Amino acid sequence: MKLRVFLACVSFLVPFVSSSATTLRVEPYTIPAADLGPENPLPMFRGDKEDDVPKLDPAIPEAERRYLGWRTAWRCLPHRMQDGYSRDKKPRTFDSLVLENECLRATFLPQFGGRLMSLIQKPSGRELLSRNPVFQPANLALRNAWFCGGIEWNTTLRGHHFLTCSPVFAAEVRGTEGEPVLRLYEWDRVRCFPWQIDFHLPPGSPFLFARMRIVNPHARELPMYWWTTIAVPERKDVRTLAPATTALSFNRDTGVSLVPLPIWNGRDQTYTTQSLSAYDFFSRFADGQRRWIAALDGEGRGLFEASTDRLRGRKLWGWGMGQGGRRWQEFLSLPSEAYIEIQAGLAQTQSESIPMPARATWCWTEAFGALEADPKLVHGKDWSSAWKATDEAIERILPRARVEQLDAKFAAVTTRAPARSLKLGSGWAALERRRCAAQGLPDPIPAELPFPRESLGADQKPWLALLEKNELPKHNPGEEPGALMTQPEWQSLLEKAKSNHWLTWWHLGNLRMEALDFDGAEKAWQASLKCQPTGWTLRNLAVLAERRGDKAKACDLMRQAWQAGPQVAPLAVECLQALTRAERYAEAYDFVAALPKAVRAHERVELLWAKAAIETGKLDGVERVFKREFATIREGEVSLTDLWFAFQEKRLAAIEKVPVDDKLRERVRHDFPPPRLIDFRMYVTGGK
């Protein structure tokens, strides 16, 4: 039996004629999982700039500088932040979609952005990915919540995707030979375009293929972004290879540098365990070079990813071997589950978007599978021989021409309507189709991407009423104000609406603020207050005041917002943040003391209270903060270790009756290293 399966898997290069061996089914998937919790009801407005241009090494050629930083500045709206999770895990069952043939078993979770959780090579029983044994959100994504493991699909904007912890649509499509193909798809709410991924696992294929399609439905250019993020196990003997001799590497202090491969800073950076700090590098390919990346162990075995030429970028990411990097690894999973990321993207780096022409459609195909190459060459000192041996091994099992042929063949499936629906995503695409139909506009979404009426839910209900009745329903300000909107077409609908109540003006102000029309936002929010004073509107005015540089006014408005209510934890956190930025520490300390017990227990309230306590010299009770495991520490955030050092400085200064000066600070950092529990410093090594 094993011999028959092996022969079926190795004979894939011969065109297949039967579809009987590929199956697609829904299966329960049970793992220890934290509750994702409620979304944050407060809108998080983007900054004033659309570009985020890093420092650039003068050695980087002009052609590679052109789009670095272009349209990469953070934004989240109309999505709300997903920051309500904890670290309490219990067994939970999710619906998974399993695509399987004789050679591979691929398991997807449509509830979490369509994440490919597992890819098992059946003849050997090997898991080809880093499969996270738990679901533990952490603060790394554009909307905060993110979890590690498997393969993630990221579009729209630099960072982990808006839907990485949200449902997407899933459907079964018939393949070129009648075999089942899994389609994942959604509507992007930030830049307003549809995207889809068709997963092909032909009978006898030892490779999983993903054919992506992005459609720009607009008569204008779109900044476009795509990166496929693949987690693979990290071990000392694992080497990441790509066909390049130089790379671009990002550093928080020096920006983007052009570096040699594989050795720089005295270490071979293709082995992630040789680096103490977190790092990445983006390979620079020669013209005409096939695009691929692989992570191979000491025996020359591992996973590779290859694609058609549109997907031009490849990246390696490692957490580093410092205490903070190791802490992050176990924080995201379990102590024994260290991983690295190999990635593939549309641009050369992740710090850039690229212009997508009006009305354009972009497609490409990626392949994922097991690879074996000569370990002596793969791990030899000659880097050129190492990557060329890997390149040749990939070409033997999956020729570049074959992938191009399959991409052309799969194109017919890309535009094919599904045979059956498997899972529903959000109702926003269905709402957009209704808006376009009501306004006599062309459908911006290909017909073969169904977004049925039943996907419309509570989030879309008030906006549907605005569209159909020219009126946004009234809403109790004691409850959360509901889903947000930033699409310009809805701004004009709100401006013409019959409804004249606080929520209509509040939403209109949100739209204007996100469009950087600060005066227009203020007018709308003042109109909202005239209709009915609410904490939601006062908070937004506080955000605007701080944006304009008036910290005192921002603090006062935040306090008014808290008094007006509803007194929810996210508002308390923002009020404390405003007081802290204004250095009104005594006021912040007293504010916490008056909070309801449930709000006082919020981890961010606790963290800000500790800051205020240290600054005001009230050190009693602060030490308990350093024994708490915080759930929402941000990637790159060092607030906990900063608090630790500040606490030790104040404590020693009081005991020894000395000032807190540079000499004391240096001593504290040498004599009082932070506990592992709170050390998330990714760029600190050797205690420095």
Role assignments for model-derived ranges:
Residues 27-69, 97-100, 107, 111, ...:
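A contiguous, surface-exposed recognition patch within enzymatic or periplasmic domains that forms
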Residues 503-507, 536-540, 570-575, 603-609, ...:
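Alpha-solenoid helical repeat scaffolds
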